[in-house]
Amino acid sequence: GLQRHDLRTGHSREVRVWPEAGYGWAPADLKYRWHWNFPLSHSPHTQHRVYVGSQYVHKTDDEGQSWQVISPDLTTNDKSHQQSSGGIAIDNLMTFDGATLFAIEESKVQKDLIWTGSNDGQVHITQDGGKNWVNVSGNIDMPKWGTIANIEPSRYDAATAYISVDMHQMGDFDPYIFKTTDYGKTWTKISNGIPKSILSFVHVVREDPKQKGLLYAGTDNALYVSFDDGKNWMLFRNNMPPAPVYWLVIQENFDDLVVGTYGRGYYIMDDISLLREYAAAAQQSSYVFNIRKAYRFQEVEAIKTDAPSLNAGRNPSYGSPVNYFLKDSVSGGVQIEIYNDQQELVRTLKGTNTAGINRVWWDLRYEPTFQPKLRTRPPGRPWVEMNAEGWRPLVTWDLDLWKGQLGPRVAPGKFTAKVKIGGKEFTETFDVLKDPNTTGTEQEIQEQVVFSL
């Protein structure tokens, strides 16, 4: 089935291409053949346009109200792969149906350039929105009957695309990633560095949206990264378990890598922007990465319940991360100074001093303020006692200062980080932005900060 769901209202409606249930029927007997994981893709150029794939490419421009077939059969249409699944109960749940499309993607840089891949090794391309299709499968040096697991059209060049080919159902567990730079006329295998094992077959390859040549790939047990456009791959795991990586999405606003794994699990690596500079950083004895923009978020208290939460995730650290690379630990340590746009020192932080990539979080606060001391009792509260020194603390919940133990959060604006490593000093500028969910103006926030100081 296929549904359109409105997140604003919670309403859903069925928008399947053809009102025919395939359960119990051999695929060869159906009008359209659908895989259990049939491809669905949104057009990056035309609002409301969506593509889905059976053995054909179907297009809608009205969010599923009507559909148009824009291709011939783009599979081998081998009838021997379209029979009943067998077993005691012939369910035909489309889990193993052959001769179906498995991947559809439209180019992000050239409208109407669409790539398709099938689960029987067929790759097609059209450059006119489906009027004419070219089969480029024969140009790829790959074994027969592979599943074109995903297609990644490049956002830097219309003629370039990447594909991953999954052969494990044919008893071949090797990694297959291919790249073309001429609209599929020629292809190069680019999977060097992914070790061969029974879990090496590739589910997905993804291009970094901001750094040409930086690629990510997911196999059946790991995540890999390439800094040289696929010529060489290296394991990219950290604390991620050896899970089958089925899908990758990069959240471009915060540069977070979202990893979807088999079993409906997902993992998030926060802020992968430093990977775009890593090749240059690794050649230096010390290097400070660009600092991304930070939001002055206000924490939102969740509704308290007694039921245990099954959510294993947690929010990233609050504030702005300062990332730097050290080839070796340095004498004298690392010190970080934060200045505002008036070149006034806001905060001094002590950095970690270990070989490799270091990350220090600035919580967007000034140095701790002086503790307020009230020397009078509150009006009408004669029972309130002073301490031995003759004063009582000001409880500044509304000012978010925690009795003077914290400094106020800075107002939105431009800031500079001076990172002192050994005898070197590096300077990076960055923005602190207002929480878009708050109603206070930047002027009001500035006045509150001045008052808190």
Describe each PLM feature range:
Residues G1-L310, S317-N323, S329:
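Beta-propeller blade termini and top-face loops
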Residues A279-L453:
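Extracytoplasmic/secretory ectodomains and luminal regions
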